[in-house]
Amino acid sequence: MSGTSLAKIRNIGITAHIDAGKTTTTERILYYTGVSHKIGEVHDGNTTTDYMEQERERGITITSAAVTCEWKDHRINIIDTPGHIDFNIEVNRSLRVLDGAVFIIEGVAGVQPQSETNWRLADRYNVPRIIFINKLDRTGADFYRAFDTLKEKLDIVALPLQLPIGIEDQFVGVVDLVEMKAIVWEGGELGAKFHDEEIPADMLEKAKEYRQNLLDTALSVDDAGMEEYFEKGDVATETLKRAIKTGTISGAFRPVLCGTAFKNKGVQPLLDAVLDYLPSPVDIEGIKVAPPEGEEEDPSANRRVIPANPDAPFAGLAFKIINDKYGTLTFVRVYAGTLRSGDTVLNTTKGHKERVGRMFQMHADKREEVKEVHAGDIAAFVGLKDTGTGDTLASSDDPVVLERMAFPVPVIDISVEPKTKEAVEKMTLALQKLAGEDPSLRLKTDQETGQTILSGMGELHLDIIIDRLRREYGVEANVGAPQVAYRETITREHTETYTHKKQSGGSGQFAEVKIIFEPQERNEGILFENKVVGGAVPKEYIPAVEKGIKVQADTGVLAGFPTVDFKYTLVDGKYHDVDSSALAFEIAAKACFREGMKKAGPVILEPIMDVEITTPQDHVGDVVGDLNRRRGMIQNQESSGSTVIVRAQVPLKEMFGYISNLRSMTKGRASFTMQFHHYDPVPRNIADEIMTKSA
């Protein structure tokens, strides 16, 4: 693949708050680029990218569908991502492998909570983005008000490239500020027909004012363009587009376009903007290699960068796994090199080789087989036996490990068991496959009850998993009520010595360990330090001590919840030449943990959620009073027209079934979103309640 064709690839994501119109916009893009001959509608349940049955029924996008399409001699790989917070893992994964993103903002509500969350994720990965203010045909739509929320809530330099002509049911087109013309859509033909005309006289002054702002902002990042402007009093369209692209890629500003995807207006100029302003794989630096295993991530560290070069050794990142009727599909973003069907690559994350079977370019759930893939491509591989999400695949000539992915902590548990004994093995295999696809889903067995416990990001997330278990794997399951994923930790330092001694004829068991337990900051995890000197505990037994603590930490001393955020330091111990063994030291470490933790100020932690409620003005009192009863801490309130946005932090335990309460309290007029924020110790009375129940 030549450099020119690499410059004609765009890997983009489409992301937004739930119901802002992502999937509808993607459907229009596929229609206008010729991939689909009929436009699918979310409310009809026949969209191309929402191809899982649950998505079509619920009208939301659950998994990131990868779709390839062509526009004006360019190839665009689009990832349509979910807007519901329970599926944030999908947004995280897709932003990680994209070169650019289109953020869709609702023209009535402006920036909503999930948009803010996704925006912060895109900031983390330095993804260049353009903004599309959608649904301008809706009653109550206001381009300028929605635009103001971009500056207020995202704290960005938002740069309009278009202004709407008309609003609500009078919306007919846009003023293009780059070329200073009006683009007006004609009726019929599903929005495929539009024409240019003069800017309406009543908008000309406003258009000139916004055009001047566009020139001042865009040319501030382009010295040659600024010189051209000073010489001629204006700049060529190509110069202005070049400056806008430079500022978009650097993040100096964020271009803003507008339209209504549902009414088929504004999508073609959006596609043009994707080509004009979002980067190709060669426009950006490339991907950094990961720091060595165990070394802290340091953003300022000067790590090697892998540029997009099809002639370099192969390097790619597996970012999604899907199990379907054809087997396991592993979605890979190719960063460097060329790979052919049948080639063998090295999984450098896990240290083993994988043979690539067939490779496909995906059009939602339809596929087109390809014989080779190159730097810049996104493709699905068949035949990989043990490659997980976030694993690097590389040539053995240059076995790099690419930047690793971080996955969120599940906050909600359910127990699940098959309705028949015969289905036990079938259910276990199915859940292992589902957990392999979704790193935010955790699977474990309760040691006391033998029950299978599923941990996920929210009730909807786990609902969908159970639904998929039934539909895709034919397993009917009994599901327990959702439970909060509590954790335990310690609040003070304590040193514990424990001796394990067992003599029952023949060789016995002996091991002694002295361990200091210390609390850590939230999210620091479990840290181990070995400070044994003089061989008091032989080196070969140190891993057994580590294993004992890690295994025992899964069952906390208060109520059996996993223990987190502590450091343990092995400082001394004793061994016996004959009776000591790895098993003896593992047993001693487990018992030392049980005894030591009881004396280190153990507490139970609960997940605290960020909750945002949008309610009519006349129900604010009821909503706030109800949140207070739920142990909520009100953060702030913000009026927006006739509605009020109430932001609070509330324990997850108090939020189960909240939607039905909110609906009855506000006669169905309020809505809310919620996402995990942090873990906090539970109040004493609730801790007692939890411990009594677990006993």
Swiss-Prot record:
Write down the CDD domains for this protein, in alphabetical order: EF-G (cd01886), EFG_III (cd16262), EFG_mtEFG1_IV (cd01434), EFG_mtEFG_C (cd03713), EFG_mtEFG_II (cd04088)
- Record flagged with keyword Nucleotide-binding: yes
Annotated residues that bind GTP are located at 16-23, 80-84, 134-137
Q: Which domain of life is it from?
A: Bacteria
The segment(s) forming the tr-type G domain are 7-282
Q: Where in the cell is it found?
A: Cytoplasm
What the entry lists under HAMAP family is as follows: EF_G_EF_2_B
Q: What does this protein do?
A: Catalyzes the GTP-dependent ribosomal translocation step during translation elongation. During this step, the ribosome changes from the pre-translocational (PRE) to the post-translocational (POST) state as the newly formed A-site-bound peptidyl-tRNA and P-site-bound deacylated tRNA move to the P and E sites, respectively. Catalyzes the coordinated movement of the two tRNA molecules, the mRNA and conformational changes in the ribosome.
| Protein name, UniProt field | Elongation factor G
What is the organism field in this record? Answer: Acidiphilium cryptum (strain JF-5)
